[in-house]
Amino acid sequence: MKKINHIPTNLEKILLISILTFFIFLTRGSHLLTSFSLPDASFVLFFVGGMFLKEYKWLCYFLVISFGIDLLSPPPELDNLYLLNLGYVGLIISYFLSWILGEYLNRTSIFSTKKFFAISLLLIVSSYLISTLTFYYFSASQIQQSVYDFVLLYFREFFIVNTVYILILLVLIKTYLYVLRNDKVSKIESI
């Protein structure tokens, strides 16, 4: 099978950075669906950044934005000390892993549905486990549940939400590929 990857143009990069920034602001404020925000899509957005932007300066840009949102807009029932603790390092590691998996997918074949789903499953499970377990073990809060119960607490919701985001991403990528191929075909036919 021919390896297919995609290198965006400058205009595509600007558009993608703007879209990712918008959706980080739209989804990062809450982990759940509220009247003001969609469920958190950060891991999938970092995955997209790794796929198409690749450069680590953009990873740093999105990390700063995410950190700023967490710092400046904690949920009313929580304070910054609850959110920003040593366990937060796991979230940063999960974002970095999401970016790396996106880069890897683009290098291997971004349009292979089988690879896309395999890497997406790895993304969802590993990002959840890393961020949840580091919070459990390294946060300063006293968690009354066992580690097993704590991990299972939000996994189903996290898995469903991120699977929906991954499916939306796959449809967008396949649509883009279809339009890109038809655009190239129409340019060739017009010559």
Question: Where do the model's predicted regions map?
Answer:
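Residue-level signature of transmembrane alpha-helical entry/exit and packing/kink sites
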Residues: E12-I17, F43, W58-L59, L83, ...
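Short helix-perturbing small/polar motifs within transmembrane alpha-helices
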Residues: K2-K3, P75-Y128, K174, Y178
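Alpha-helical membrane segments and adjacent membrane-interface helices in multi-pass membrane proteins
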Residues: F36-W99
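Membrane-embedded alpha-helical hairpins and interfacial helices in multi-pass inner-membrane proteins
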Residues: T108-I191
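Hydrophobic transmembrane alpha-helices
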Residues: K2-F52, K57-Y61
